[in-house]
């Protein structure tokens, strides 16, 4: 079998729910223990909603069921109890072995919890009343009577298995299933009861037990119109078996809005729908088929899509299943009365051996995402190694296989049994067990999951169907008016707000038009995106209380609350670090402000007995913080349900991955505290663990409290009310009103139980060390370096931003003159408007106007200023030796990082801080060795190193430790099992369960964050938090490519996946164009050959078989098919490996003087080339926030002067702007015959920045290091110009033929006749000479192309960037019709063209002019929309270089394959043209 492309899977262990705490540990027998835990289940109902997976019911014993029916189940039960001697002897009733418990998995914390439920009082009374007058012949009443005879506290909800479960608006619904017969304790019967569990009240209620509805089990249930308020919401019940094990083919529909079955609705709208294909009924069962409900399809008619093995469908249809399968196993069934199912098309181009597997999957499961169906199953048997995952593209019928191997699969053999699609996070989840237990998929395990991202689905969207099959991509839901096309059910009564709603819908379409660049819907619904855009563009300034400072010195405002909510833990870390430092400085100076009520000593002394023992939750939010600490301002939410037992919540809240003194929380606390984190608050953005996910449209009234109250709680000071706009004190150390914040007395035992995730520690805990016993030993001018959270960073931001390099080694006292730096250079978080500079030293001369542009008002506020501190006069201590381990910021090499699990987008907060080593000043050891001051050592699991050096002398060049060298401590191990969440961008304000109020003092809260990126990129970064989507107007470069790196470094997995989705779309267009060109070229070659041989098929086939070029085209086409099917192409991979190996051997003499890559992603980089973001920021400041989150294994300390690859446009503030000035660039390469550019301010960002940034702008290093000077030397410039000139001469002489070939199609004979006899006679010898000349240059040419891949972190010379920017179209014009507007009249690129092509004979002026104008508008819309043209090769190379930085192996390989195929096709096209010319010569003399 071919080798699959790289897997993007990562596995995570799940913490199973513990037994409830009881006074008697022996109270639970074996049956009860199994019911209350999730070790094994058979026939439980499982569903995923939002960020939770719910499980209900099921047998608690593992049963291998080849087929699910009541007879087989009874047989397996008898065999099981016969084998189990102990169980067999003690067996009394089958109910003991069936669970009725409800569990849910919090995907963010990866922890299972049990929901403690009760029974609805009204329903219970109704049941008792009915039971008292029950008739003997009524089965349901018999069941109720039996229940009445039992325990009074027992819920009437019977234990069941093989039932269905779904979620809607904060409620769980279950239907049907098998229950134990009341007549016998071992017989199972089907039921038709429909139950509802309200997750707000945790009470069950019986909705229906209508005897007219068929009893069934082993079926599925779907929710229809969940997000449409204008239509009734319904439950669609599909498939299953009845009591006689006969299939139920009728689809039952329950109308939730009217609380009745569809046959009883008013007005009557019966719907008779049966599962069928072409009118022939089909039997669906959950164990052999799966079904999904697709509402947003092209026809605007909700339809079921179900999977059934192709041979089974053929049996129903009476076809011979031995024949080659031409239809996929996917059947679409519209939900209309008497509708007929249709088999979905399948791509016939796939070979039969690849179709056997997806057509014959066993135990299939799946879901849909965008216009793709993700399917998982087993073939040919149930062995765990035979689990396969496929993506079926609805548009093209394409099947593509996805690798599911994870980094841990070599150690543990996993068994997965269920596939989920986590749509809000664009991920697929595989649920199963870590170690293969050799059970069949009918045995359900819940201790392990694996995830892989879904943006890759866009790469499979090859448009093979006819035009009428094409589905237009839209981010908008189905227009309401389109629902009237089918008479499913009447629309609800029009309300008085319908006109306003209609106007708002029109406004939505105007403000947030449908995106054409993606087949996947946006994260947020349209109205949410509109609100976000309005907040950004209209109310951005009034709402903003925080700002991003860009590398160009611009300020971009954004609300701090929004960042905490949607950026999450990473931002919390930055904020807490800086806030802690400010508070510590305020305390150190011992100067009290009239605006700040802060008494750390008294509050500390009075808090010893107040703080209750608390444990950290796995997730949290600002909402939960308000709910617990400020209930007056809180929203009605889950916490109100928890307030009934606040002491339980505080005592039993537990970190999911942290051992504690009490191993298991009580059932009441676990259920009350964790059972409803997301779904109780139905119609607001409350999803703590899901910061940017779509919210279901609620059908109830709003449960918000007045929003102004919520604002007041977060924006008011403890003294003078709302003072967000008040600038901060500059000299006086400042802090928050932490009287309540400090009311915690953490014991060492308590600390030892805390997890070491950075984001789980609120600033209240961070401040503990700043008030330690040794606080009076600090010098007033000495920065706080023992903050418990940031031992490795020294100061909250100033030291944190020194992760990789420090500029103080060249000027140890430059902190005394902060004016030497520009505003943006000093605008890192906490030091824009705090009491110290970026180095952490106090400054009295700087005012707030530096960061806000407003006049200082400190005098007006009468804030007392302390006396200026003395300048330090002691000399800096000497630099430590290179081998000193304690000063190594990161412990692993780049190569180690590239192959580490921590490189994944799902990497949690902790993984990016494991294994770090810090530079801790000697003064720190004096007090951080004390028990209270060593909070960091206990929380972060780091041990202080002796002999560490002063903060002023950390060397810029750190040693390179051995690969995989890490710091192993009891609480910090370099493995993946300690991760806190699947995705790490979780807001974490609720990470400390306690009863003391924690309020940030607005005067002390940092308000600016320096980001070493261009303004356009940072603006887009901020826009994402407002809208939750990718803007189609963003430039591919620098914005989109920068955002990919930012999302990885700053840990925003959703943004990472959205950008990847766009990049995959661009790559898919390139591959599709290569496939079309290859097919067209082969058909043209065959047609011309057939014509030359007068239609003789035999001679034609013989000639083509012996023609090397045609055979190469065949191989290239096969390669494209293999890659598109999800497999490696062995030949292509072998060629690339050889090329990379030869390049590696020659790398010592390469132009850029760096070690080169070997293989896909095997990077080793020289220490001389460090991109700015790694080095810590532009302008050699090395203190930027860009270096904060880069993975800990990247120990790439470099030379003293940094490269500027990550901040290419710095307004005359670095050497880079002198080397690359946009105006200079235009002047040198401005088209002579075209329209010149205007250098106004508007074009400076949009058009002007393009030439600087399009291809390598972020990563094309223009190094000022002496070791890199060779790459921009005059010698290389001259050599490159000579090579380029030779290449252009060859290209120019053949330009007419090449351009004509681009317009050629297989029916076009006129183009072939254009090659005259003279041209033919001169062409071959001349081409021969040209080819000889090319061979002379081929070595250097190949070397150039190799160097474009063999680089350290994407660094190319300036010459190469200029050359490619100017001449890329000439290199690619034989295969890339990027500027051929005449052939694509619908292309959006035409709108930006300033010239039109008037002559086809000479295309050079046209292409030159078009290139600059077209490139300058390379927005995502123009690159990835449905009408976009294929990108040129250099765009793919740029994506590849960016992908190397983020270590996305799969995309890396696809880009390399695509570029290699494009290069091969370009060469083959020229050779094929030569062969066609020869054929003309053969056919001419023939009679």
From Swiss-Prot:
Stated role: Negatively regulates early sporulation-specific genes. Seems to exert its function by positively regulating the Ras/cAMP pathway. Required for growth under alkaline conditions. Acts synergetically with PMD1.
InterPro entries linked: Beta-prop_ATRN-MKLN-like, Kelch-typ_b-propeller
Protein name (Swiss-Prot/TrEMBL): Negative regulator of sporulation MDS3
Main location per the UniProt record: cytoplasm
Region (Disordered): 639-720, 772-796, 810-986, 1134-1169, 1189-1214, 1263-1283, 1308-1341
Gene giving rise to this polypeptide: MDS3
Polar residues biased stretches: 639-648, 883-895, 946-957, 965-986, 1189-1206
Location(s), subcellular: Cytoplasm
Family matches, as Gene3D superfamilies: Kelch-type beta propeller
A GO BP annotation: sporulation resulting in formation of a cellular spore
Residue ranges with Low complexity bias: 658-677, 824-847, 1138-1150, 1263-1273
Ranges of biased composition (kind: Pro residues): 864-880
